[in-house]
Amino acid sequence: MSYVHSLRVRYGECDMQRVVFNANYFVYVDDAVDMWTRHALSDELAKAGSSTDLHAIGFDFMLKTTQLTWHSPVKFGDTLDMHCEVSRWGNSSFDVAINGQVDGDSRFDAVITYVSVDPKSQRPSPIPDIVKEALSK
């Protein structure tokens, strides 16, 4: 499934050149994946009596690695569209590829590796099928 998360770049997220400060790209992609996950799992979360708590469905995930390749700047006032999709499924880890675009022009590519963890022990655990299904639609 490809999910698009959009945001407008605010002044406080930029440096003196009025371009996004480099660390904020990582905040943006993490937020995009969080929004996508909760959107894709919204029916399962509702059945479990929650709208946001992934623990209610027996799932949580933590970042292992992030890689970002910058192509051109994202600037103050731009609307940034982040196209997210799972690019690799493992047993307990998965990769999410994100392409950041402004007006259809690619500004960066990121790949994040996440590890599925048991919410109680926070130890790696197999990715639940409901998560794989939801993020693969």
Segments from the language model and where they lie:
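Terminal targeting signals and extreme-terminal segments of soluble enzymes
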Residues: M1-D81, S87-K137
